[in-house]
Amino acid sequence: MVKKSKVGSTGRFGARYGRKAKRTVKDIEDKMHAKHVCPKCDRPGVKRTHAGIWKCRKCGAVFTGGAYIPTTPMGKVAKRNIKRITGGE
């Protein structure tokens, strides 16, 4: 029995581009296509429409975020600082 390879979405590249590059692409695409929670309605259903633009399928909210994930580490820091300055609303 042949051992099955777990190439995922990078199987489309075939033997090209090398193992490390394909692994990086697979990790990014897995994070991008995962279930993301909407910051407005707190429901999972956020989809990426363009690079950095995300839309909730439930409430229709459109917001910006990272290119591959809706919230970036710097965005989390900024949100925390704003909450601290305004009094934690």
Swiss-Prot record:
Q: Which InterPro entries match?
A: Ribosomal_eL37/eL43 (IPR011331), Ribosomal_eL43 (IPR002674), Ribosomal_protein_eL43 (IPR050522), Ribosomal_zn-bd (IPR011332)
For this UniProt entry, which residues form the secretion signal?
none
Region (Disordered), start-end ranges: 1-28
What does the record give as the organism's lineage?
Archaea, Methanobacteriati, Methanobacteriota, Methanomada group, Methanobacteria
Q: Which cofactor does it need?
A: Zn(2+)
Keywords, alphabetical: Metal-binding, Ribonucleoprotein, Ribosomal protein, RNA-binding, Zinc, Zinc-finger
Coiled coil residues, start to end: none
Q: Which gene encodes it?
A: rpl37ae
State the organism named in the record: Methanosphaera stadtmanae (strain ATCC 43021 / DSM 3091 / JCM 11832 / MCB-3)
Zinc finger (C4-type) in chain: 38-59
In the record, biological process GO terms are: translation
**What's a single GO CC term here?**
ribonucleoprotein complex
Q: Which family does it belong to?
A: Belongs to the eukaryotic ribosomal protein eL43 family.
Among Pfam families, the record links this protein to: Ribosomal_L37ae
Protein name per its UniProtKB record: Large ribosomal subunit protein eL43
What is a GO molecular function of this protein? Answer: structural constituent of ribosome
Note the superkingdom of the native organism.
Answer: Archaea
**Cofactor binding: number and manner:** Binds 1 zinc ion per subunit.
